[in-house]
Amino acid sequence: MPKFNRIHLVVMDSVGIGAAPDANNFVNAGVPDGASDTLGHISKTVGLNVPNMAKIGLGNIERPAPLKTVPQEENPSGYYTKLEEVSLGKDTMTGHWEIMGLNITEPFDTFWNGFPEEILTQIEEFSGRKVIREANKPYSGTAVIDDFGPRQMETGELIIYTSADPVLQIAAHEEVIPLEELYRICEFARSITLERPALLGRIIARPYVGEPGNFTRTANRHDYAVSPFNPTVLDKLNEAGIATYSVGKINDIFNGAGINHDMGHNKSNNHGVDTLVKALKDDNFKEGFSFTNLVDFDALYGHRRDPHGYRDCLEEFDARIPEIIKNMREDDLLMITADHGNDPTYAGTDHTREYIPLLVFGKSLSGQGHIPVGHFADISATIAENFGVDKAMIGESFLDKLV
């Protein structure tokens, strides 16, 4: 019988808590990540008021220097630590896959200067459409259609762009490039990006509608992902008949592998929390695991190097934690963590190689305090032990520390 009937894992996308030991092996605009510190720099430069995470123990996490504006609790309400990544990457898929027990020794490719001409030419030859070269770089999905949508409406050219993650995205006006054609082009792009030098995690169809100055992306987005190369703890749970709920982009990150209840994409962090609360209240969800990703920290503020917006986003999420806890059952466990860093005060616009925080709370827990510093996959090893399934490739359970 499991110690906790339900475990809920919330990933605050990109909320790192200080440079990892190997951070200098990773760079941003030519600057090594060794001085990056997402939470530390936000707390120091613009102030951070997150009383609910502080109460669990966020300010108590072992660091070279305490978080400037997050107090340390004498009697925290939960357990806390920080975790180190072992995989060779600092992107979303690598972080999430490692959290679920995989060691990624061959990272996906990212294209900070846009995709090579060879890929664009192959897509042009397959589709019979030209590619707008000026869009071929990391771009905001809404900005890229504002900037190049009018041209696409006139010429029928493809808008191909990327991001900090290993993705190739194709935006197409639905009245100019029909959905079925867009999907066919994306399937081809998927077929030519399955190995180096262009090993990509996802190809994303990004259809939109509207007129210049008033474009909106539609719900007809489609992701062409790759499944994890080995079974994750999600797969182990699913094979054992245990419920696995995904909220936000989790289903995309794992290409649906091991997930038996997908709750859909988030419109915002708040919408994601609403969806999680809906799962918490679900009478049919008696036992199992929920996995939520909240991406606004990363997508809206980290990459845009906006520390004020990032702080506000953290405070907004923190204010929802009492609602999450209120809807937890006595035998539920909540874990709040991240998947990498994205220091909004740092050089460049890429993710940063950092430790991630881990906060653990359960109504049935009488103990509290520090869990030894471990690795990302310790999360899934703990989940696996709780539900009586095998862990994946790596990870050490801390279930016995939770009393």
Swiss-Prot record:
Its cofactor is Mn(2+). GO terms for biological process: 2-deoxyribose 1-phosphate catabolic process; 5-phosphoribose 1-diphosphate biosynthetic process; metabolic compound salvage; nucleotide metabolic process. GO terms for molecular function: magnesium ion binding; manganese ion binding; phosphopentomutase activity. Pathway: Carbohydrate degradation; 2-deoxy-D-ribose 1-phosphate degradation; D-glyceraldehyde 3-phosphate and acetaldehyde from 2-deoxy-alpha-D-ribose 1-phosphate: step 1/2. It catalyses: 2-deoxy-alpha-D-ribose 1-phosphate = 2-deoxy-D-ribose 5-phosphate; alpha-D-ribose 1-phosphate = D-ribose 5-phosphate. Disulfide bonds: none annotated. It comes from the Bacteria. Keywords: Cytoplasm, Isomerase, Manganese, Metal-binding. Mn(2+) 1 binds at D13, D339, H340. SUPFAM superfamilies: Alkaline phosphatase-like (SSF53649), DeoB insert domain-like (SSF143856). It is found in: Cytoplasm. Belongs to the phosphopentomutase family. PANTHER family: PHOSPHOPENTOMUTASE. Isomerase that catalyzes the conversion of deoxy-ribose 1-phosphate (dRib-1-P) and ribose 1-phosphate (Rib-1-P) to deoxy-ribose 5-phosphate (dRib-5-P) and ribose 5-phosphate (Rib-5-P), respectively. This is Phosphopentomutase. It comes from Streptococcus sanguinis (strain SK36).
